[in-house]
């Protein structure tokens, strides 16, 4: 796997000195207990108690420090007492890290027989957080609000999912995509504004001639090749015959060459295209699948937006059950409508139901030798299918909630990995909505991530998001698209 960096989240509690020093000390004690309680759960990332904020200068200095700290992936704020929101304006205005407004309180229950005004003055989250929430709305800053008791399991799960989105946002600002060759000729949706992508999303996209990659492939040693083949033999079912073995060996050579090229340039995502293979013996298939399983992003036919999207979603998902995907063909059986997703070769084995098998079959596109690839059925379960498109003036993230199902029949003549799913709210409505929103045929499919996480990432990134789920109707979606168009046009003025 690509080595992940260490990230923490700062916990900052709002208060004021109006209630006296003892009250501030009590707020600090309670804040530390909440942090310890959050860290006792199943959070992927550590919550670090930072301070009780009681002044404008204190907030500003703290947020400036957070901006500079490379390990800080975001700030969690909570108002234990009333905290006048004017003191938060400079800090919030300068903050460039993800922000979670955690609306909770230290005590779960009202102490009916003991409650007095001292208790009321300390435990004012119910209206202290409303004051703080107003200034967030007034400033128009992107933020997440999670309400609930801090020991509640569902609340912790919501915080954990937001943390994953925040870390993906921070890390995705440094994604570098290597493009081998150009886009597939005459295809529209895989094009896009690379400058705007770097400005808006932080993604850097570089193009290379295929000869640069071929040089690395040809430099692979026989020893490293032999070691990788041994790994293949342990992980996958193997084809019979010497010709098939030679095809697999060539994919291993491509994998090693690709990985060395990407590692040396600091690239964590890449694209290929069957129209640019001069000097290569095969279109990368098994090699791409293996690299995706290690956390690399990939896009077919030069689709750099999807390559970066896959990398970002891989980071958000911790590398689990996430893959490059394409809507391929429909099953229109009444009452059982489904979509079969696949691609020519490149589906990540992280979504495989069983042990993948290596197969070698002809591929008409590319006019090269028969490429080896992993073939498997995808797992069943809830998932999201996500596409990123460039509308010329802005990016739009299109999200569809789906339910992947077990493939009901053998497909012995289909030589590629495949996934079968039922889109929400139905195939007919989801397809109409997807097409109206301009969603691409290339997507990233993830079983680990939720639509809410993708919406959170879009909010952090400042891009439009369209969600297609059980509540979607075409009339409402048409109106939403019109409102979004108007809103983004107004942003330019």
UniProtKB/Swiss-Prot annotation:
Binds 1 Mn(2+) ion per subunit. It is an enzyme of class 5 (isomerase). It holds the Pfam family Arabinose_Iso_C. GO terms for cellular component: cytosol. Its EC number is 5.3.1.4. CDD domains: L-arabinose_isomerase (cd03557). Keywords: Arabinose catabolism, Carbohydrate metabolism, Isomerase, Manganese, Metal-binding. It catalyses: beta-L-arabinopyranose = L-ribulose. Pathway: Carbohydrate degradation; L-arabinose degradation via L-ribulose; D-xylulose 5-phosphate from L-arabinose (bacterial route): step 1/3. Its cofactor is Mn(2+). Transmembrane segments: none annotated. Gene3D superfamilies: 3.40.50.10940. GO terms for biological process: L-arabinose catabolic process to xylulose 5-phosphate. Mn(2+) binds at residues 301, 326, 343, 442. One of its GO terms (molecular function) is manganese ion binding. Catalyzes the conversion of L-arabinose to L-ribulose. Belongs to the arabinose isomerase family. This is L-arabinose isomerase 1. It comes from Bacillus licheniformis (strain ATCC 14580 / DSM 13 / JCM 2505 / CCUG 7422 / NBRC 12200 / NCIMB 9375 / NCTC 10341 / NRRL NRS-1264 / Gibson 46).
């Amino acid at each position: 796997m690509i080595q992940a960096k260490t990230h923490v989240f700062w916990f900052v509690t709002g208060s004021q000195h109006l209630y006296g020093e003892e009250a501030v000390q009590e707020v600090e004690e309670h804040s530390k207990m909440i942090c310890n309680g959050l860290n006792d759960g199943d959070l992927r990332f550590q919550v670090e108690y930072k301070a009780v904020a009681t002044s404008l200068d204190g907030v500003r200095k703290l947020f400036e420090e957070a901006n500079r700290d490379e390990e800080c992936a975001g700030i969690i704020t909570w108002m234990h007492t009333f905290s006048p929101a004017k003191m938060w304006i400079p800090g919030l205005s300068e903050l460039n890290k993800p922000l979670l407004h955690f609306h909770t309180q230290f005590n779960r229950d009202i102490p009916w027989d003991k409650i007095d005004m001292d208790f009321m003055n300390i435990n004012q989250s119910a209206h202290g957080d409303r004051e703080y929430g107003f200034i967030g709305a007034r400033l128009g800053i992107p933020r997440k609000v999670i309400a609930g008791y801090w020991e509640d399991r569902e609340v912790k799960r919501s915080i954990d999912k937001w943390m994953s989105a925040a870390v993906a946002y921070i890390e995705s600002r440094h994604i570098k995509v290597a493009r081998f060759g150009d886009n597939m000729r005459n295809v529209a949706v895989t094009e896009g504004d690379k400058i705007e992508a770097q400005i808006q999303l932080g993604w850097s996209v570089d193009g290379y001639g295929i000869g640069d990659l071929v040089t690395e492939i040809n430099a692979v040693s026989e020893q490293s090749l032999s070691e990788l083949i041994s790994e293949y033999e342990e992980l996958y079912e193997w084809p019979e015959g010497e010709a098939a073995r030679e095809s697999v060996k060539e994919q291993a050579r491509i994998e090693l060459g690709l990985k060395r090229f990407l590692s040396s340039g600091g690239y964590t995502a890449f694209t290929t295209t069957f129209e640019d293979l001069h000097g290569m013996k095969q279109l990368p298939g098994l090699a791409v699948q293996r690299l995706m399983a290690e956390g690399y992003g990939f896009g077919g036919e030069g689709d750099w937006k999807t390559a970066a999207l896959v990398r970002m979603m891989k980071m958000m998902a911790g590398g689990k059950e996430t893959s490059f995907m394409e809507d391929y063909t429909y099953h229109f059986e009444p009452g059982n409508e489904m979509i079969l997703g696949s691609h020519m070769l490149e589906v990540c084995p992280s979504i495989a139901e069983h042990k993948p098998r290596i197969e070698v079959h002809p591929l008409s596109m590319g006019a090269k030798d028969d490429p080896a690839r992993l073939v498997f059925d995808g797992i069943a379960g809830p998932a999201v299918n996500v596409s990123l498109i460039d509308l010329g003036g802005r990016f739009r993230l299109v999200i569809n909630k789906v339910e992947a199902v077990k493939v009901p029949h053998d497909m012995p003549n289909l030589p590629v990995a495949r996934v079968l799913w039922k889109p929400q709210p139905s195939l007919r409505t989801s397809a109409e909505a997807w097409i109206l929103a301009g969603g691409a045929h290339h997507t990233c499919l993830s079983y680990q991530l939720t639509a809410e996480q993708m919406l959170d990432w879009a909010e952090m990134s400042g891009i439009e998001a369209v969600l297609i789920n059980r509540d979607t109707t075409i009339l409402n979606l048409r109106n939403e698209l019109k409102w979004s168009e108007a809103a983004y046009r107004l942003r330019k003025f």
